Amino acid sequence: MANKPFFRRRKVCPFSGDNAPAIDYKDTRLLQRYISERGKIVPSRITAVSAKKQRELARAIKRARFLALLPYAVK
């Protein structure tokens, strides 16, 4: 009995495609989704964000932290 190997479907980047949200450092509700409960940036292999958009996202999160819109760490 031959088993087929488990096929994991590739997730699609939430920031690519039509009517995708723009990455903006002032949009804290959107950025909060990509930060862990400890305040760290969640890696793209978990969130399925493309490499280019992950860099934009990280830059926006760091900008928002600098302007005190988001916390650096959560206790």
Swiss-Prot record:
GO terms for molecular function: small ribosomal subunit rRNA binding; structural constituent of ribosome. InterPro entries: Ribosomal_bS18 (IPR001648), Ribosomal_bS18_CS (IPR018275), Ribosomal_bS18_sf (IPR036870). Keywords: Ribonucleoprotein, Ribosomal protein, RNA-binding, rRNA-binding. GO terms for cellular component: cytosolic small ribosomal subunit. The keyword rRNA-binding applies. It comes from the Bacteria. GO terms for biological process: translation. Belongs to the bacterial ribosomal protein bS18 family. Part of the 30S ribosomal subunit. Forms a tight heterodimer with protein bS6. Binds as a heterodimer with protein bS6 to the central domain of the 16S rRNA, where it helps stabilize the platform of the 30S subunit. This is Small ribosomal subunit protein bS18. The gene is rpsR.
